[in-house]
């Protein structure tokens, strides 16, 4: 079976270095908050182009802690999209704030900036933009809105490690950037891991404190925090993989280029790419004009496991339905989930698997 993602490939490619890094941690005296985490935080800041990075347990925690650091609380509102991983919205709800869903662009599937300003009011405290599938949002427009209203921007970069907008790395443009190192991601560890980036010293120190019970340097909890840390083992692995992230992303781009030039079926549309974005293709998501479910079944019968990201938007999920405002217009969000399909995309994907995927998609018919 050929899967749309294969985490093991990221290990096999650099197994010798990764095994050595794991062994070094196991024989060290520090498994939590040691030199590997500090090194990775520094390396990642240098890579992204921010002053500070804070390793945390996962991307959901990164967003939650960032919201808390900004001061988001019950009664506040946070604008974001419904077409995202549930964790984006779970982090908002976790603070007691209300997520306000806005629609996405039908072209790029990123946040529709025209809808953002319509939903801003006195309760709006943060806007979370999601760089979905590895593609940047329209950050110029978002930052203009941010400046106009004085609203902080959190970049959800969970799927966009290494991506750029007008030459700048995502995660360095907003107030805070939040990253995931889940095993399927472009930059991945072998468990859960996340990180927040910022240029604001106060936010850096606040996120760091909140991620460790709200402690100050004397272990006196000044705020009610939580326990969310990137451990030494994951950091050691990430230090190895970060060296190769640009190379791995380039491999994804090459696969995407081959798909775009070789898949030629009137029923299938390729993902649009913004001219201002260096797209790193965490996922390659096609749109099927007719027979989407039939296509998925057809691929599976022929040894290819395709996915849907995401089959159920967050506002349709039971726990979050109550947050949908009567005035919310999520037409594009609800439209695209009926047609999108994620086809195989990961560094290490073999040519024979790529070619098989292309051939099967070109042969697909609803007849």
Residue ranges and their predicted role:
Residues 68-157, 164:
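PLP-dependent aminotransferase-like
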Residues 29-77, 83, 91-95, 101-103, ...:
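Phosphate-binding glycine-rich loop
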Residues 8, 35-42, 47-53, 114, ...:
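PLP-dependent aminotransferase class I/II
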Residues 54, 79, 100, 152-154, ...:
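Structural detector of well-ordered beta-strand residues that form the stable sheet scaffold
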Residues 155-190, 205, 217-222:
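Conserved active-site segment immediately N-terminal to the catalytic lysine
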Residues 1-30, 35, 302, 344:
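N-terminal "arm"/small-domain region of PLP-dependent enzymes with the aminotransferase-like
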Residues 59, 96, 156, 186, ...:
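Conserved G/P- and acidic residue-centered "switch" motifs that form tight phosphate/ATP-binding loops
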Residues 179-180, 194-199, 239:
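Short beta-strand-to-turn element immediately C-terminal to the catalytic PLP-Schiff-base lysine
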